[in-house]
């Protein structure tokens, strides 16, 4: 599929992009080449191939939560430069 100048300008307007003349010419060629690649892919016989959105086996990367002992709250708070009750007090970053 060959994209002409008007096609590129239409796509640019949809994407809210301002293009220079040289960019329009370059993108016309690049996008046309990209669409030609998709046309080739559309001709591939996929009979018997199950549709998928994942090309590699999906495995859960989540781990079970394990409760481990940690530092005592008072040990941590005793190292804070400033504290307020059971919280570390920091200076205001945004008003």
Swiss-Prot record:
UniProtKB keywords: ATP-binding, Ligase, Nucleotide-binding, Protein biosynthesis
Pfam families, A to Z: GatC
GO BP annotation list: glutaminyl-tRNAGln biosynthesis via transamidation; regulation of translational fidelity; translation
Gene3D superfamilies given in the database record: Glu-tRNAGln amidotransferase C subunit, N-terminal domain
GO molecular function: asparaginyl-tRNA synthase (glutamine-hydrolyzing) activity; ATP binding; glutaminyl-tRNA synthase (glutamine-hydrolyzing) activity
Record has Nucleotide-binding as a keyword: yes
Enzyme Commission code(s) on record: 6.3.5.-
Annotated catalysed reactions: L-glutamyl-tRNA(Gln) + L-glutamine + ATP + H2O = L-glutaminyl-tRNA(Gln) + L-glutamate + ADP + phosphate + H(+); L-aspartyl-tRNA(Asn) + L-glutamine + ATP + H2O = L-asparaginyl-tRNA(Asn) + L-glutamate + ADP + phosphate + 2 H(+)
Family: Belongs to the GatC family.
Known role: Allows the formation of correctly charged Asn-tRNA(Asn) or Gln-tRNA(Gln) through the transamidation of misacylated Asp-tRNA(Asn) or Glu-tRNA(Gln) in organisms which lack either or both of asparaginyl-tRNA or glutaminyl-tRNA synthetases. The reaction takes place in the presence of glutamine and ATP through an activated phospho-Asp-tRNA(Asn) or phospho-Glu-tRNA(Gln).
Description of how the protein assembles with itself and partners: Heterotrimer of A, B and C subunits.
Protein name: Aspartyl/glutamyl-tRNA(Asn/Gln) amidotransferase subunit C
Lineage: Bacteria, Bacillati, Chloroflexota, Dehalococcoidia, Dehalococcoidales
Gene that this polypeptide is encoded by: gatC
């Amino acid at each position: 599929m060959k994209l002409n100048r008007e096609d590129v300008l239409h796509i640019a307007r949809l994407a809210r992009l301002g293009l220079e003349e040289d960019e329009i010419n370059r993108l016309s060629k690049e996008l046309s080449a990209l669409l030609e690649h998709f046309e080739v892919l559309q001709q591939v016989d996929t009979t018997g191939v199950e549709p998928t959105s994942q090309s590699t086996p999906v495995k859960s990367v989540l781990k079970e939560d394990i409760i481990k002992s940690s530092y005592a709250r008072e040990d941590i708070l005793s190292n804070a430069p400033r504290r307020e009750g059971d919280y570390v007090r920091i200076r205001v970053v945004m008003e």
